[in-house]
């Protein structure tokens, strides 16, 4: 079922994290969830030209902390920080608690699934051919380090009468592998002949799970030569009875017949 399930929900608590990080009892949960949805819709409209990829909402101890991930943080902040202050006051009015807003820059917008999907939908609304927009996005993502990408568009493509679905893939996108870092996003293009949906999967490589440790290759230590080693190398292994004792002491040697005064000669 890796092809059908939501890639982010499938990997929650394994390699992905939640977009809303707070706890609530049964009485307040629905209201707080609806509040988060309203905040995200407001930020999507307000920061339409700021290339916002993700919004993370946290609620620590009667406060709210909102982190906005954008590839154009200057547009969010505005001249001398005026826009960010207006945004903060509006969010405080909507949420009813003090709000802290953080801006994080997306270093590679070409490999962010949400920004890719939004870029394709904007091109479709400007009547650019969908195949050209999809293939250009795939080439840019692969050029900047993505290991695989898949893009699917569905609807009345190019204004045809019957809706259809087309998708393209480059590289590999392992949807069943839990340790695979799959970035997934969707977007909609509102055209004159209907809505066109765009889905994007970006494979950025494997990530370490909670119980995994990084694999370090063992480097074999160089064998240092002994100080008094013979030039020929190590000695050959000794046989039984060799070395360490008097002559004739090895096992199985014939005993002398003569005494000590016969000069060591054997009896004739």
Curated annotation (Swiss-Prot):
Region (Disordered) residue spans: 216-268
Biased composition (Basic and acidic residues): 232-242
InterPro entries in the record: KH_dom, KH_dom-like_a/b, KH_dom_type_2, KH_sf_prok-type, Ribosomal_S3_C_sf, Ribosomal_uS3_bac-typ, Ribosomal_uS3_C, Ribosomal_uS3_CS
Disulphide-bonded residues: none
One GO biological process term: translation
Positions with biased composition (Low complexity): 248-257
Domain of life: Bacteria
HAMAP family attached to this UniProt entry: Ribosomal_uS3_B (MF_01309_B)
Subunit structure: Part of the 30S ribosomal subunit. Forms a tight complex with proteins S10 and S14.
Function: Binds the lower part of the 30S subunit head. Binds mRNA in the 70S ribosome, positioning it for translation.
The protein, known as: Small ribosomal subunit protein uS3
């Amino acid at each position: 079922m890796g092809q059908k399930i939501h890639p982010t929900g499938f990997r929650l608590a394994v390699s992905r994290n939640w977009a809303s990080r707070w706890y609530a009892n049964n009485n307040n949960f629905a209201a707080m969830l609806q509040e988060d949805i309203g905040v995200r819709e407001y930020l999507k409209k307000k920061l339409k030209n700021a290339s916002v990829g993700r919004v993370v909402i946290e609620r620590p101890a009667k406060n709210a902390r909102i982190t906005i991930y954008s590839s154009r943080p200057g547009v969010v902040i505005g001249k001398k920080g005026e826009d960010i202050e207006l945004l903060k006051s509006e969010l405080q009015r909507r949420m009813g608690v003090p709000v802290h807003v953080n801006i994080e820059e997306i270093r590679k917008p070409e490999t962010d699934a949400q920004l890719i999907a939004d870029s394709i939908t904007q091109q479709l609304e400007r009547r650019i051919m969908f195949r050209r927009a999809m293939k250009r996005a795939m080439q840019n993502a692969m050029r900047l380090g993505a290991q695989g990408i898949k893009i699917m568009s569905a609807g009345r493509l190019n204004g045809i009468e019957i809706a259809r679905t087309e998708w393209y893939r480059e590289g590999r996108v392992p949807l069943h592998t839990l340790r695979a870092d799959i970035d997934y996003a969707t977007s909609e293009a509102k055209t004159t002949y209907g809505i066109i949906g765009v889905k994007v999967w970006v494979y950025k490589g494997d990530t370490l799970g909670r119980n995994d440790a990084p694999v370090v290759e063992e480097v074999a230590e160089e064998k240092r030569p002994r100080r008094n080693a013979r030039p020929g190398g190590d000695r050959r292994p000794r046989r039984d009875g060799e070395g360490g004792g008097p002559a004739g002491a090895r096992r199985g040697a014939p005993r002398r017949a003569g005494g000590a005064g016969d000069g060591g000669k054997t009896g004739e």
